[in-house]
Regions:
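Long, contiguous hydrophobic alpha-helical segments, chiefly transmembrane helices and signal peptides
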Residues: 25, 88-90, 97, 123-125, ...
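Short secondary-structure boundary/capping elements
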Residues: 100-104, 129, 164
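Short amphipathic alpha-helices and their capping/turn segments at secondary-structure boundaries
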Residues: 73-78, 131-135, 172-173
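Aromatic-lined substrate-binding rim segments of carbohydrate-active enzymes
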Residues: 109-112, 118-163
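An active-site-proximal structural segment forming one wall of the substrate-binding cleft
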Residues: 161-173
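Secreted/periplasmic carbohydrate-active enzymes, especially glycoside hydrolases
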Residues: 1-120, 139
Length: 173
């Protein structure tokens, strides 16, 4: 537990975290998708005003795109190990996004896991998914290849538009 004092306005914090004998998150088929729970609470004058709980998996993921004997490689490396990607493209489950229940997400990820997939790509013509999607992906050892929502049309390249794209990318990452 750590207490920090915030100033009015935007506060950017970086707090050290220590985990005894940490286990790495592994993709489906490689071992356990180890997750660690953490919680952030905001109190004002001793009164709880906000609380956020989340799970994280400790891992490194890298896209390897290097010159090789055939031209250029392109593969994922997870925790320093090359990964053979087995997955599918994902489009929104329903045109009415709020109608996608937790149970439907759970069924989707059960099916993905049972099909021995380890990655799912969210198509750029779809939508940024609900947090439940990403949480279930983590819990089931599924990497998410997240397209940005820029598909099927040319886009402007003026500074104002590019600034908005940058903001969208930062928000969604």
């Amino acid at each position: 537990e750590k207490t920090v004092r915030l100033q009015p306005g935007v506060n950017n914090l970086s707090l050290p975290l220590s985990i005894d004998s940490p286990h790495l998150w592994m993709p489906n088929g490689w071992g356990e998708a180890a997750l660690y729970a953490f919680e952030v609470s905001v109190c004002v004058d001793g009164k709880l005003v906000a609380k956020k709980q989340h799970q994280i998996g400790l891992r490194t993921v890298r896209v390897v795109h290097e010159k090789d004997s055939l031209g250029m490689s392109f593969y994922f490396e997870v925790n320093g190990i090359p990964m053979f990607a087995k997955g599918a493209n994902y489009i929104p489950q329903d045109a009415l996004l709020p109608s996608v229940t937790t149970e439907r997400y759970q069924t989707l990820f059960r099916d993905i896991k049972e099909a021995n997939m380890n990655v799912v790509r969210i198509w750029g013509g779809g939508t940024y998914e609900d947090d439940r999607f990403y949480d279930l992906a983590d819990e089931n050892g599924i990497l998410v290849w997240q397209d940005f929502m820029f598909a099927c049309t040319p886009y402007p390249s003026d500074p104002t538009f590019l600034k908005r794209v940058e903001e969208e990318a930062c928000y969604n990452i």
